[in-house]
Amino acid sequence: MTGLTYDSGALIAAERKDPRLWAVHKRALARGVLPIVPAGVVTEVYRSGRQARLAQLLAGCQIEPLAETSAKAAGVLLGRCSIDPGAVDASVAESALRRGDCVVTGNPEHIQALATGVNRKLDVIRI
């Protein structure tokens, strides 16, 4: 299994006990793959310490800070994209493209449009 990058849709699915998301997550951990969650994704989803399922998911993930070079690369993705998916989706796409990860997402159209804008392709798992 390649690496995984989670977007906001994946974290929301975890909160909602989506069995598809939890199956992907457990399979990744069993294979020694630690999913990546860009920090902006946490900002979009986290609201309080009472989100037990979100906390459980994040305990088995690596939160990736947004470095200046990554922020600029995500901005380039936005500038070349045919739609306006937003800065957080751009940071998810940049993060996954940099490592060759598969993106676990509720909105594959946004992620794929960002990659297409720079003539790249990202594999996605729709949740």
Model-derived features with residue positions:
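Acidic, metal-associated active-site segment
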Residues: 86-102
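Phosphate- and divalent-cation-binding pockets in alpha/beta enzyme and binding domains
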Residues: 44, 73, 113-114
